Amino acid sequence: MRRAFFLAALALAGCDGAAKEAPAFPPADRPVASIISARWSNEEARDRVNEADKIMDLAGIDPGMTVADIGAGEGYYTIRLSQRVGEKGRVLAQDILPEVRDKLAERVNRERLDNVSVKLGLPGNPMLPAKSFDRVLMVHMYHEITAPYEFLWHLHPALRTGGRVIIVDADQPTQDHGTPPLLLQCEMEAVGYRLVEFQQTAFAGGYLAAYDAGGKRPEPNAIKPCALRKPAR
């Protein structure tokens, strides 16, 4: 019954998002990395350094939580999130590529992960139901979001009270498949998020930044785009 209710909420979220006229958002004022693979690194290598457990610990992901795995790819985190939140928790695994979504759905069914749902999102809208998630996890994919302000704006209402967006990325230029922390903070704050925690995570290839929805979400036409400028000489 709980799974059916969750799936119904996802369906309603998709219908609501499609029915409304799309507002105008500013484009990203920096390069956007292309999607080159559904996997960031080999799962066995990641498990050798206990990556997923360490990230979930830092993110405060506990049994019974509802978590969205955005840009889930082949499901490295999806599988481990399912184990962490347990039968009383829920995991939504989302990707924007239909073929990746389909392969992940096959894996979820094969491994009988009854607390996991798999959903197709849009580049500028994760299509998540409002006030539904304790954590939203994005690992090594933020730099691939083609419309970050639109995406983050639509994501904002999906957090529950006390919910957090957890971003893991490399501290390098976006065109090199990373996001400089100051640029990330600027883009997040521009859409109404607030930085609540920052940790270096060399074992996961970069850093972890946690944001809540404590700021006010502006109207789309009031969002001021960010860019890292080279200092004047």
Residue ranges of predicted features:
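Conserved class I S-adenosyl-L-methionine
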Residues: 164-187
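A short SAM/SAH-binding and catalytic strip from SAM-dependent methyltransferases
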Residues: 134-148
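A short glycine-rich, Lys/Arg-flanked "PGG" loop and its adjoining helix->strand segment in the class I
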Residues: 82-83, 149-164
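Core SAM-dependent methyltransferase catalytic element
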Residues: 201-233
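Class I SAM-dependent methyltransferase SAM/SAH-binding core
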Residues: 68, 72-126
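A short acidic, Gly/Pro-enriched loop at the edge of an enzyme's catalytic core
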Residues: 126-136
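Class I SAM-dependent transferase core
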Residues: 16-68, 76
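C-terminal motif of bacterial Sec signal peptides marking the signal peptidase cleavage site
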Residues: 12-14
